[in-house]
Regions:
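P-loop (Walker A) phosphate-binding loop of NTP-binding proteins
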Residues: 3
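Conserved lysine of the Walker
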Residues: 8
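Post-Walker A alpha-helix
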Residues: 11-12, 16
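Conserved substrate/cofactor phosphate-moiety recognition/catalytic segment
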Residues: 17-55
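Conserved nucleotide-binding/hydrolysis micro-motifs of P-loop NTPases
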Residues: 28-31, 79-80, 120-125, 171-174
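Glycine-rich phosphate-binding loop used to anchor ATP phosphates in small-molecule kinases
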Residues: 48-110
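A glycine- and Lys/Arg-enriched "phosphate-lid" helix/loop adjacent to the NTP-binding pocket
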Residues: 83-153
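NTP-dependent small-molecule kinase module
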Residues: 127-139, 143-191
């Protein structure tokens, strides 16, 4: 888990490939409200977050209830991500209804065994976002990334119910540096 552009997908794919385990990636590109949200956040926050909630539930539920899939999986997101983003993006009233629906759905899912929380400087997040080149993300405000960062920290400190480990990627470019990747794996294994 972690902020937008921190490297969740890249790390999950690398670990999945190296350890021959399935990788469950977030279906963000299927959300019909995502691009609209960045243009008009007040108008599209609610449909965006409810779509993500239902899509994440379906994705995790389908995976874990399929008898033909391994129960070991690496994912670039968790179900609780929905709460973190909804708390930032929704009004207090909308969030209350959202949280009730989240709670009804979450009891139907298995909890992850471990969560790895990736951290990165806000400036580097912005660079990573620019490099990956999704047009709708290019004008993302650093204040929004800061809110997400604070939202994750608040959730981890006050609501997290499974073991988690925080890894600061500021000096660990695991994409370009194998030694950095091995250090990350050591942290994960030791956890």
């Amino acid at each position: 888990e972690g902020n937008i552009g921190v490297g969740k997908t890249s790390l999950a794919q690398k670990i999945g490939q190296d350890f021959k385990v399935p990788v469950l990636l977030e279906n963000f590109s299927k959300n019909p409200y995502l691009e609209k949200f960045y243009d008009q956040p007040d108008r599209y926050a609610s449909p965006l977050e409810f779509y993500f909630l239902e899509d994440r539930f379906k994705q995790f539920n389908d995976f874990y209830t399929n008898p033909n899939t391994s129960k070991k999986v690496v994912s670039d997101h968790s179900f609780f991500k929905s709460l973190v983003f909804a708390k930032i993006n929704l009004s207090v009233k909308d969030y209350e209804g959202f949280k009730k629906k989240y709670e009804r759905l979450s009891v139907q899912l298995d909890l992850p065994q471990k969560v790895i929380f990736l951290q990165q400087s806000l400036d580097q997040l912005k660079v990573n976002i620019q490099i990956r080149g999704r047009a709708y993300e290019q004008n993302m405000d650093l204040d929004y990334l800061k809110k997400i960062d604070n939202g994750y920290r608040d959730f981890l400190e006050n609501e997290m119910t499974v073991p988690y480990c925080s890894i600061d990627l500021t000096a660990l470019d695991f994409i370009k540096n194998e030694k950095a990747y091995q250090l990350i794996l050591q942290r994960i294994k030791a956890f």
